[in-house]
């Protein structure tokens, strides 16, 4: 009987020894930049560039869409992607990562001198030809 009572008294004590979520030493690692959405637009034009533009900033968004032939469609697609992303901790940015027949499956995101840089992952099985070139725009979250 004493063993059962001792065990019952020990359980709440051990539960009280759980980690403290307010302890800064136990917080999750710093957030990493991540791909939020890959937009694929047919015949949008543009230029592949690793420079990422913060699309929630009106000036940056305007500077980004100026590089496209079909500015209105690109602006609408990027704005919809921002809306679809919902509330996020970091800032959303866009970069044109590929133009051609293939859509990259992922991207790598690094810190550049002036702004984040986004580069397409290597295409593992490229298509030889396509009906119309597509422009791949990576929308990424930068913590």
Language model segments and positions:
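Post-signal peptide N-terminal segment of mature Sec-exported envelope proteins
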Residues: 25-46
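Extracytosolic low-complexity repeat regions of secreted or lipid-anchored proteins
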Residues: 91-143
